[in-house]
């Protein structure tokens, strides 16, 4: 069974993640320090990190150093800057809390892409594009196209 670490400062998020990811072994941490300890002492197949409340980007650096793929989680509306920062620091994907009920299918897709050696970010950007288009003008796409993450 694949091991997942979910890090968030909201206990109700843990309940939802554990319910949605019932086919995985899920461990949770509610603070930066608790998550940091787990990241350096345990092994995970995937890490899910809240981007804001628990210093998720700092935890992302640790997860990447430990070679754990990480999905960034945010309660806030999509922000191309947060998406870009997450990608540049090594996250494999990004999801909003409003879409957390889709986390199981996202992880299945990510594990499949990682196993095949394919880009997780091309997949992620195709999934996020309609939401980003609705929130921002189409210019957000230019930077991602230059990086080879968009081909549409």
Q: Where do the protein language model's features map onto the residues?
A:
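Alpha-helical interaction/dimerization surfaces of two-component signaling modules
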Residues: 16-21, 38, 62, 85
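CheY-like receiver
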Residues: 106-107, 112-152
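Acidic di-acidic motifs
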Residues: 6-9
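Extreme N-terminal starter segment of soluble prokaryotic enzymes
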Residues: 1-4
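A short, hydrophobic beta-strand element within the central beta-sheet of small alpha/beta folds
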Residues: 48, 60-63, 67-80
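Two-component/phosphorelay signaling modules centered on CheY-like receiver
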Residues: 11-28
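Alpha4 helix (beta4-alpha4-beta5 surface) of REC/receiver domains from two-component response regulators
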Residues: 58, 77-105
């Amino acid at each position: 069974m694949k091991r997942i670490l979910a890090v968030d400062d909201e206990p109700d998020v843990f309940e939802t993640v554990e319910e949605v990811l019932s086919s995985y072994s899920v461990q949770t941490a509610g603070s930066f320090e608790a998550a940091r300890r787990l990241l350096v002492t345990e092994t995970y197949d995937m890490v899910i990190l809240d981007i804001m409340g628990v210093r998720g980007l700092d935890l992302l650096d640790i997860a990447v150093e430990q070679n754990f793929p990480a999905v960034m989680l945010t309660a806030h509306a999509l922000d191309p800057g947060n998406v870009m920062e997450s990608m540049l620091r090594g996250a494999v994907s990004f999801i909003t809390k409003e879409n957390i009920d889709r986390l199981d299918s996202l992880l299945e897709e990510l594990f499949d892409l990682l196993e095949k050696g394919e880009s997780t970010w091309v997949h992620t950007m195709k999934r996020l594009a309609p939401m980003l288009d609705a929130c921002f003008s189409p210019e957000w796409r230019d930077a991602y196209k230059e990086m080879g993450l968009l081909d549409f």
